[in-house]
UniProtKB/Swiss-Prot annotation:
It is a peripheral membrane protein. SUPFAM superfamilies: N-terminal domain of the delta subunit of the F1F0-ATP synthase. Keywords: ATP synthesis, Cell membrane, CF(1), Hydrogen ion transport, Ion transport, Membrane, Transport. It is found in: Cell membrane. F(1)F(0) ATP synthase produces ATP from ADP in the presence of a proton or sodium gradient. F-type ATPases consist of two structural domains, F(1) containing the extramembraneous catalytic core and F(0) containing the membrane proton channel, linked together by a central stalk and a peripheral stalk. During catalysis, ATP synthesis in the catalytic domain of F(1) is coupled via a rotary mechanism of the central stalk subunits to proton translocation. This protein is part of the stalk that links CF(0) to CF(1). It either transmits conformational changes from CF(0) to CF(1) or is implicated in proton conduction. The gene is atpH. This is ATP synthase subunit delta. Pfam families: OSCP (PF00213).
Length: 183
């Protein structure tokens, strides 16, 4: 079975437990914390995946790092991943869990590229407008400042891209001038 399929199974199981307990939001935030710890501390993953490290040492490190800081269900999932030598799947598990949780709540993540930072009011307006377009109740907007787009906005929601940036328009104009207009 591929790692992707295995990660999905762990995420679905964790999601179902979160649903039973009504803890979607807290699970998402705790899993994001775990993801950040693993991304910021590559040595942690190296230690937990090293074949010569004893399982008891791995458990002790997990307890020191996460016990009492995350829900017991999440902690137990980490222990199972370590015991089954699957801890390297933690980031895909977190991403899939987050996706399942957001889908259940009709939430989508949107990455908005702009030449300057957006105000909260602008983010709220974009959230309302584009949430309707993609059939979601709410968009969680992450603003990425990219001066290279010159002006306007470029929005990525899932696999959809809405490019209203000046750079995007200049790129289209350049292509048309080089190869002729599209029919």
């Amino acid at each position: 079975m591929s790692n992707h399929a295995v990660a999905n199974r762990y995420a679905v199981a964790l999601f179902e437990l979160a649903q039973e307990k009504g803890l979607h939001e807290s699970f998402v935030s705790e899993l994001e914390l775990i993801k950040a710890v693993f991304q910021d501390t590559p040595e942690l993953m190296q230690f937990l995946t090293h074949p010569k490290t004893e399982l008891t040492q791995k458990r002790e490190l997990l307890e020191k790092t996460f016990k009492g800081k995350v829900n017991d269900t999440i902690f137990n999932t980490l222990v199972v991943l370590v015991e089954r030598k699957r801890i390297d799947l933690i980031i895909p598990v977190v991403q899939k869990f987050k996706s399942l949780s957001y889908d259940a709540q009709k939430i989508a993540e949107a990455f908005v590229y702009s030449a300057k930072p957006l105000s909260e009011a602008e983010k709220d307006q974009l959230s309302v407008l584009f949430a309707k377009k993609v059939g979601k109740a709410k968009l969680l907007i992450e603003n990425i400042v990219d001066p290279s787009i010159i002006g306007g906005l470029k929005i990525r929601i899932g696999d959809r891209i809405y490019d209203g940036s000046i750079k995007g328009q200049l790129d289209v104009l350049h292509r048309e001038l080089v190869s002729g207009p599209r029919s």
